[in-house]
Regions:
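General detector of N-terminal leader/presequence modules that precede the first folded domain
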Residues: 116, 128, 133, 137, ...
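Flanking helices and flexible, charged tails adjoining ferredoxin-like Fe-S electron-transfer domains
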Residues: 241, 263, 306-403, 551-652
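Basic (Lys/Arg-enriched) interaction patch that binds polyanionic ligands
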Residues: 281-314, 513, 517-520, 529-548
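Terminal amphipathic helices with adjacent charged low-complexity linkers/tails
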Residues: 290-330, 401, 408-411, 415-417, ...
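Flexible gly/pro/ser-rich segments immediately N-terminal to CXXCH heme-c attachment motifs
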Residues: 293-303, 503-508, 531-541, 569-570, ...
Length: 652
């Protein structure tokens, strides 16, 4: 493994120390480094727990505040690319070490308390010895589908029979509903007796052990802490379940992976459905409709981040890590590599389970990664959307790659990659610079990475500031060398989160229902005349305007546009107002008023041989006045008697 300490020290480290076995014979070097006040980076993760334990013990003794960062350079930039130049390897190592020094933002979390109340769901009494043993440490209730013929009550567990109907919640807060539920009569003699049955019996518990169901009772079982399932288990599985259940007692921190801001959510308005991208993307089924917005079940959420990558309004934000920090890491990796190697790297997004292990195996048993491929680890690659891919290219990488894992939802990655491809189609950048790699073996991974290097791209001066939509606009503008003024349009497909709308002027009555329903403020009207305007930069193609329009006059037009006009109000449809025949004040829509008059005048008994048609031509104030003084006004009384004067009496 090549490791140039002097070259790396020139890249910003105060001191670079090389060892052969940091976790073994050279462990004293690790202790010495951690026993100081300066921040430390260990370029080895194999014995991370050892180093973290040493740091913890030293901090307890001396109250040290030095931070410890760990990164495995061996798998990523050591045992790799045997034909790579010394300069390339050093550049890659410097980039990874610079990334390791970045201060990671903390993930918000909430406390989850489990007191050890455990529910066991089983077929028959064969599970009772397991319940007896587990009940020595947990508060156990065992619910059997088949009541036992004879069994003695136990002080270690409660026994009941029933069939589970539903289960909701997570660790420390499961809500369970049973049918045919019946509890053991503990005072009976002879055959086992149970009390009266009850449907819809409700209960709560902290831990659920399911020994019955072949399929999970809960959606997203893998993300539900506290739900342990093993249908028809053998003794070894029961022992494992027992150990896991006992470890689920106490207070835990549950990460809150996403934040939700309902005020800018484009899901629904007035019972009309608009954007459903997050609901469609969530493989854990943790998101559901909730009035005008959505509800995210944090107990079900596994933190994949797919919802945030497709949310067009940033109503859902991913916090592990935030998008802004992800971009900071991208810029750090690429700028450090380019500065040292004078060439552009490829960024490979991998997850911390499948992808990381595949890279480690490739490094240990084969050629490993090419010298220009820098792995970027995330918890789940589903959080990588079109904005992240474009940010990589905008920061100066030669390619943005995603390594799929078996647990990755295929549609989420495919849709975002396809959207990126469509956006790049309107630029001068080669669309092959973005790719999704499906590799189940070392050979497939290396086949996809070796021999496919692209020439260094043109360097773009992109700030990469703001959220996903802002970064996307900046990168595409740089790639098209847009002057900021000239209109430019890139055709997209239905469902893409950029575009405008078209209004059929023959159908539209300018009722402005669409304006009132637009969740992003992209649609607006004017105070002086009937008119619909759009700010295209704010349109997310949620479809609420089209679904709300009573005349079906609106059609979505997906496109990505650049230019000053996308930030300004652009008229879609407008007409002159009708002028009141009494006071001249403009009101309503001229064509609508004229159409009403055409359909009523002389064709309806209330508008035949009367002046009622004139009322339609009046503004609201003049109409009230005219009706009040009309001779046929329903509240009109008889004519007021003439006032009699003295002269009247004298004349009489």
């Amino acid at each position: 493994m090549q490791f140039d300490a002097d070259a790396l020290q020139q890249r910003g480290f105060d001191q670079v120390i090389t060892t052969d076995q940091l976790c073994g014979s050279d462990l004293d070097v690790a202790v010495s480094a951690l026993n100081q006040t300066q921040d430390v980076v260990f370029a080895c993760e194999q014995q991370a727990q050892v180093f973290e334990q040493i740091q913890y013990e030293l901090s307890q003794e001396d109250q040290l505040n030095a931070s410890l960062s760990l990164i495995d350079l061996r798998d990523r930039a050591g045992w790799s690319a045997p034909d790579a130049s010394h300069r390339e390897i050093t550049a890659k190592q410097a980039a990874l070490l610079a990334d390791a020094q970045l201060e990671r933002p903390g993930t918000p979390a909430r406390e989850v308390t489990s007191n050890g109340t455990c529910l066991i769901i089983a077929h028959d009494a064969s599970v009772l010895p397991f319940a007896e043993q587990l009940g020595e440490e947990l508060a156990v209730t065992c619910v059997l589908e088949q009541p036992p013929v004879t069994t003695a009550p136990s002080s270690n567990y409660d026994l009941a029979t029933g069939k589970i109907r539903s289960i909701q919640g997570g660790l420390g807060a499961f809500d369970v509903i049973f049918d045919r539920f019946s509890t053991l009569t503990v005072s009976g003699r002879g055959a086992t007796q149970f009390g009266p049955t009850q449907d819809g019996a409700e209960s709560t518990c902290d831990i659920v052990i399911d020994l019955v169901n072949e399929t999970s009772l809960l959606a997203a079982e893998a993300t539900r802490d506290g739900y342990l399932r093993a249908p028809n288990p053998h003794p070894i599985e029961l022992a494992t379940l027992s150990a896991r259940a006992k470890g689920l007692v106490g207070t835990f921190d549950k990460p809150l992976y996403v934040r939700y801001e309902g005020s800018i959510c484009a899901h629904s308005r007035s019972q009309q459905t608009g954007c459903t991208r997050c609901i469609d993307t969530c493989g854990a089924k943790a998101i559901r409709s909730n009035g005008d917005g959505v509800y995210i079940d944090q107990d079900m959420c596994g933190g994949c981040g797919g919802c945030a990558s497709v949310c067009p309004t940033s109503a859902i934000l991913y916090d592990d890590p935030p998008f802004e920090f992800l971009v900071t890491r991208v810029k750090t990796l690429i700028s450090t590599y380019r500065g040292a190697a004078n060439s552009a790297p490829r960024i490979l997004f991998v997850d911390r389970s499948f992808g990381k292990q595949l890279i480690a195996n490739a490094a240990r048993f084969s050629r490993g990664l090419p010298a220009d491929v820098i792995p970027y680890e995330v918890d789940n690659v589903e959080l990588i959307g079109h904005a992240e891919l474009l940010a990589v290219l905008g920061a100066g990488a030669s390619a943005a790659l995603i390594l799929k894992s078996p647990r990755t939802a295929k549609t989420a990655i495919a849709n975002q990659s396809a959207l990126t491809d469509r956006l790049l189609s309107g630029t001068t950048v080669d669309r092959q610079r973005v790719a999704v790699i499906e590799a189940d073996s070392i050979e497939q991974l290396e086949s996809a990475l070796y021999g496919t290097a692209l020439p260094d791209p043109k360097s773009f001066d992109v700030a990469l500031l703001g959220g996903r939509r802002e970064v996307t606009k900046q990168v595409i503008a740089a790639m098209t060398e847009h002057d900021g003024e000239t209109p430019l349009h890139i055709a997209l497909e239905p469902g893409d989160p950029y575009g405008t709308i078209e209004v059929d002027s023959d159908k539209c009555t300018l009722c402005l229902a669409c304006v009132s329903q637009c969740p992003t403020g992209a649609l607006n009207d004017r105070s002086d005349r009937p008119e619909i305007n759009i700010v295209e930069n704010a349109c997310v193609q949620c479809g609420l305007c089209a679904n709300t329009c009573p005349e079906t006059a609106i059609t979505l037009k997906p496109q990505f546009s650049l230019g000053k006009q996308t930030l300004d109000q652009q008229p879609l449809h407008g007409e002159d107002p009708f002028e009141c025949i009494e006071c001249g004040r403009p009101f309503g829509v001229k064509s609508t008023i004229e159409k009403i008059i055409e359909k009523l005048d002389g064709k309806h008994w209330m508008y035949t041989d009367s002046d009622n048609t004139r009322l339609v031509k009046m503004c609201d104030d003049c109409r009230v006045s005219a009706q009040y003084h009309d001779e046929n006004a329903p509240m009109r009384g008889p004519d007021r008697p003439r006032v009699r004067t003295t002269d009247d009496y004298l004349d009489s």
